[in-house]
Amino acid sequence: MLNEAIKEVLSGKDLSESQSEQVMENIMNGQESSALIAGFLIALKMKGESIPEITGCAKAMRNMAVPVKLKSQYAIDTCGTGGDGGRTFNISTAAAIIAASAGVKVAKHGNRAVSSQSGSADVLKELGININLEKSKVEHCIDNVGMGFLFAPSYHSAMKNVAGIRRDLGVRTIFNILGPLTNPAFVKGQVMGVYDRKLLEPAAKTLLNLGCERAMVVHGGDGLDEITTTTVTYVCEVKDGEIRKYTLSPGDFGIKTTFYKNIAGGTARENAAIIMDILKGKTGPERDIVVLNSAAAIYIGKKAEDLKEGILRANELIDSGKAYAKYEEILNYNN
């Protein structure tokens, strides 16, 4: 089947959603050779992944994931595609903790570093969080504490069939896009960063196809898969079954534009130290970018009416010590 799919894609045709779902199912089940999988991934990348292709592949991966069952009716994720080459510290991970302190239920889906020095799993481990917590405890932690970490390899075991191929190819493929779209808790809210502005609308439409209620799909004008503070950010917002496009600027919220070097990260240990400083109230550009991304998570988590209120809440939670207290609560539950 993959042979035929490659021929179609090479001729410039888009695969249907059902074709894409079947192809991804075969890949995940180990039914296709490494050479064919690599050929398919590169052919798809060269053509450009269509919305039906992304949706079908995401559905296959979601169907094969170990499901996380929450009592909470509404939970969110703060997860980007990565692959932006930005090498910032783990902004969305810090934002997840602050959003949880606002009362948002956060099912943080993530992995170890692929192209950066520190993935969400790496930095959470440095922060003392058990990234291999058993599923029932993660479910309880999200429902009762407010945030739990879903370590991707534990919930998408079939990914082992493509891990080596992705590593050998060394280029971004559809799997970069699929990571944030395949949260095993099937969250209804999402702040999703993408590495390419062209992916904003396809990602937003795919989220709608997958039943997402609220989302902000974001891409920084500097290339970051976050809401940035160095320049404008492009946004596709999903709300009430519709997609709205707009741009954000740090100045819109009274935040000073900064230089990239001021939000750069390092090793997992260095990034954990930056996050700890922010949670303890340190001010500066690193806090500014975390507050802006936390505001988005609080807004998508339905705990603020808009981003401006989200920023006020994020700052209050940090300054009052509630954000750090939430981190300690998560830490204590995980150990």
Swiss-Prot record:
Instruction: Summarize where anthranilate 1 binds, as residue positions.
Output: G80, N111
Q: Which reaction does it catalyse?
A: N-(5-phospho-beta-D-ribosyl)anthranilate + diphosphate = 5-phospho-alpha-D-ribose 1-diphosphate + anthranilate
List of residues binding Mg(2+) 2: D225, E226
Entry keywords, A to Z = Amino-acid biosynthesis, Aromatic amino acid biosynthesis, Glycosyltransferase, Magnesium, Metal-binding, Transferase, Tryptophan biosynthesis
- Identify the EC number(s): 2.4.2.18
Kindly give the Pfam families that the UniProt entry links to this protein: Glycos_trans_3N, Glycos_transf_3
Its required cofactor(s), as named, are:
Mg(2+)
Residues recorded as binding Mg(2+) 1, renumbered to this chain, are S92, E226
Give the GO biological process terms.
L-tryptophan biosynthetic process
Does the entry feature the keyword Iron-sulfur, yes or no? no
UniProt: anthranilate 2 binding residues: R166
Which residue ranges traverse the bilayer? none
What are the annotated GO cellular component locations? cytosol
| Record text on subunit structure and interactions | Homodimer.
Query: Of which family is this protein a member?
Result: Belongs to the anthranilate phosphoribosyltransferase family.
The record, for NCBIfam families, names: trpD (TIGR01245)
Q: What is this protein called?
A: Anthranilate phosphoribosyltransferase
Query: Which lineage is the organism of this entry classified under, starting from the top rank?
Result: Bacteria, Bacillati, Bacillota, Clostridia, Eubacteriales
